[in-house]
Amino acid sequence: MLHQQKVVEIYTDGACSGNPGVGGWGAILRWNGHERELYGGEVQTTNNQMELMAALCALKALKESCSVDLYTDSVYVRNGISLWLKGWKKNNWQTVSKKPVKNKELWQALEGVCSFHTIRWHWIKGHTGHPDNERADALARKAIAEYRENGCFSA
């Protein structure tokens, strides 16, 4: 009997106060009537790194192979995973202009976790009132605020 993959919707966002600076990421996972919020951050990071971390940490949180619709407002993440990654690997992790790919370790980690799931990547325009994108953004900003208030990330 074939195993039916659990269907999961994920909404992700990253934020950075200064670029580089203190950054946060947020993710909402929704499946079968359930929902989970995740967030975290880094002290010295970039917005693109936080966008990657949001997707990476959300996918790592899945405990079994799933069918995933992942929504991001980051063209960098969506294009990187679906258009640029194969070329980067073929070119020994260099861009078409022969420069080292930024955030190589995060891209490698994301590619690794993606291999366990069936993922459809979706781009949604950020800061246009999409409720789940706004919630993911609020979680990313919450991580930054908690760091500023407590000197650490609590999530």
Swiss-Prot record:
Q: Which UniProt keywords apply?
A: Cytoplasm, Endonuclease, Hydrolase, Magnesium, Metal-binding, Nuclease
Catalytic activity, reaction form: Endonucleolytic cleavage to 5'-phosphomonoester
Stretches assigned to the RNase H type-1 domain? 4-145
Q: Where in the cell is it found?
A: Cytoplasm
Q: What class of enzyme is it?
A: hydrolase
Tell me the GO molecular function terms.
magnesium ion binding; nucleic acid binding; RNA-DNA hybrid ribonuclease activity
Cofactor binding remark: Binds 1 Mg(2+) ion per subunit. May bind a second metal ion at a regulatory site, or after substrate binding.
GO BP annotation list: DNA replication, removal of RNA primer
- In which residues is Mg(2+) 1 bound? 13, 51, 73
Sorted alphabetically, which Pfam families does this protein's record hold? RNase_H (PF00075)
| Annotated Gene Ontology cellular component terms | cytoplasm
| TM annotation in the entry | none
The Swiss-Prot or TrEMBL record lists the needed cofactor(s) as: Mg(2+)
- Check the record and name the PANTHER family matching this protein: RIBONUCLEASE H1 (PTHR10642:SF26)
Q: How does it assemble?
A: Monomer.
Q: What does this protein do?
A: Endonuclease that specifically degrades the RNA of RNA-DNA hybrids.
Entry protein name: Ribonuclease H
Species this chain originates from: Bartonella henselae (strain ATCC 49882 / DSM 28221 / CCUG 30454 / Houston 1) (Rochalimaea henselae)
Print the organism lineage.
Bacteria, Pseudomonadati, Pseudomonadota, Alphaproteobacteria, Hyphomicrobiales
The encoding gene is rnhA
